[in-house]
Amino acid sequence: IRYMLPIYPMFTIFAGWFLSEIIIKFIPKRYLKNYLITKCLILLLVFFISIYPMSFLSIYLHPNTRIQASDWINKNIPHGSRLAVEHWDDSLPVYGMQNYTQLTLPLYDPDTKEKWMNIESTLRVTDYIIIASGRLYLPLQKLTDCKNLPANRCYPLTASYYRNLFSGKLGFIKIKEFKAEPTIPLMNFGINDISADENFTVFDHPKIIIFKKE
């Protein structure tokens, strides 16, 4: 999305031109000459165009999910606990990390025997697993067709790990989740944007999940 920013103004111009052509073609001119009808059409158009921007802005009415998660961790997870986080992602909490022992789960590494020996030994001493975003678990669960993927980019064991983690079969249970999503004003209706570009779901307002060892 960020790479397309320079052409967004052109999109706006073309969208306005397109809507103008639709109005001219499908609405009789005698109605367009009526000031009240024209004003109502413009207001209606502005209303519908504004729905998503206003919904998206609602995300920033609350603290960033990383800050919310960090506050909760420092208040609710005992100091000295061992927190396992995924590599290639942000570490949490963003402050107060000196009060905890941080462990790393190299889940993006190829699905080798050595990788899983390392992860299993880490999980044995882990008290909490923190998933800081969908950067790994969303794409890696889809990369399981080893017949059509390079061997070092196929993750059937990692996909199985995530299924077991989310179902509670791994020995950890989900105790907290932090998420922020666009919410339509007045209706309090959330728009699930988990499949949107990483700029939204990883960098801007990531969904954070915390698991505790049973």
Show which residues each predicted segment covers.
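Membrane-interface junctions at the ends of membrane-embedded or membrane-associated helices
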Residues: 15-44, 214
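Catalytic lumenal/periplasmic loop and adjoining terminal transmembrane helix
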Residues: 40-209, 213
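Hydrophobic/aromatic-rich transmembrane helices and adjacent perimembrane loops
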Residues: 1-23
